[in-house]
Amino acid sequence: IMKQGQENQVWIAGGIGITPFISYIREHPILDKKVNFYYSFRGKENAVYLDLLRDYESKNPQFELHLIDSTKDDYLSFEHKKIQKRATVYMCGPLTIMKPLAKQIKKKSPMSELIYEGFKFK
């Protein structure tokens, strides 16, 4: 599905929501789109695939990795981040994180296409 998105993409993963992005990265070693990837996690011990992500970034100049450790940094927010006018935004993570981010993104860039998979832990 990410292959069909706009030329400018934003990927957002919260915690274990990184899984579908890792699957895509493994299947597509070279990117043909500009991607800003935001990966939010709670503590370094919960951050998975960091070596893979850094390696992917080093091999793909169009892939920009942003790591957000919520134990050290503020929570991920798009209040002050630039989003391309017609970007495709893919999000996967807990609904408590994804819903507020989706609102911020739509407010900031109403023409962006937003595709997300949120989940709740029971």
Named regions from a protein language model:
Residues 1-122:
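FNR/FR-type flavoprotein reductase catalytic core
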